[in-house]
């Protein structure tokens, strides 16, 4: 999860987030090289009064600075399109969970079970226990099996919300009257925190999301108790 004064992205927990981290580094490297070149040229122009008259109207130079940016954009676009298609791909999910956004809490329904649903509210600051995180803890966590494909169906009952868990590379809008879907797969157990990422009213900041990724055997025990 995030920590104070963090500069980079959160550690990846899912294959999609790992791909996003690689794409981020790839794009940042290209941007850094371009910025360095531009700053170098500007510094040369500011520190010398010499002018190359042969480059004032050179077709070759114009050709280069037209083709080169096109190549750079292609190098950025191709990996981006690949990841976009990966994020939309859904192959035989092992479990489906429906989440509904409300002002200002989330409700969850495990559609593969007959009667397994609950609401998830933020725990107020004055009720937190030692070691719990302010504005991020909830009274009912979403327990999911790790190393399995889980499909999330996301919608809203009132206004626009957005269901986001950064360490899993997830951010899907919750739109009234529309059912969006995304998939997740965590590669290791743990607690993963997120928040509503769409301004939805006065208590927008108080809609945390907590996913508890556990081994399949523990999940089966938990679901049997909950049902």
Swiss-Prot record:
Keywords: Copper, Electron transport, Magnesium, Membrane, Metal-binding, Mitochondrion, Mitochondrion inner membrane, Phosphoprotein, Respiratory chain, Translocase, Transmembrane, Transmembrane helix, Transport
Gene Ontology terms: cellular component: mitochondrial inner membrane; respiratory chain complex IV
Cofactor note: Binds a dinuclear copper A center per subunit.
Molecular function as annotated in GO: copper ion binding; cytochrome-c oxidase activity
Binding site for Mg(2+): 198
Entry's localization field: Mitochondrion inner membrane
Protein name in the entry: Cytochrome c oxidase subunit 2
Gene: MT-CO2
């Amino acid at each position: 999860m995030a920590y104070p004064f963090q500069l980079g992205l959160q550690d990846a927990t899912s294959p999609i987030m790992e791909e996003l981290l690689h794409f981020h580094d790839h794009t940042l490297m290209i941007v850094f090289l371009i910025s360095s070149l531009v700053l170098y040229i500007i510094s040369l122009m500011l520190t010398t009064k010499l002018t190359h008259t042969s480059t004032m109207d050179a077709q070759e130079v114009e050709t280069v600075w037209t083709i080169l940016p096109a190549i750079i954009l292609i190098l950025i676009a191709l990996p981006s399109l690949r990841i976009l298609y990966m994020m939309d791909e859904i192959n035989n999910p092992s479990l489906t969970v429906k989440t509904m956004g409300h002002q200002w809490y989330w409700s969850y329904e495990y559609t593969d079970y007959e009667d397994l649903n609950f609401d998830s509210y933020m725990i107020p600051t004055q009720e937190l226990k030692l070691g719990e995180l302010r504005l991020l803890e909830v009274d009912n966590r979403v327990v999911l099996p790790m190393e399995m494909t889980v499909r999330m169906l996301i919608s809203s009952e009132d206004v626009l919300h957005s269901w986001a868990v950064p360490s899993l590379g997830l951010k899907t809008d919750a739109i009234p009257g529309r059912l969006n879907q995304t998939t997740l797969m965590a590669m290791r157990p743990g607690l993963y925190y997120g928040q509503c990422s769409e301004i939805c009213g006065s208590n927008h900041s108080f809609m945390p999301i907590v996913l508890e990724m556990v081994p399949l055997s523990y999940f089966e025990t938990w679901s049997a108790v909950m049902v």
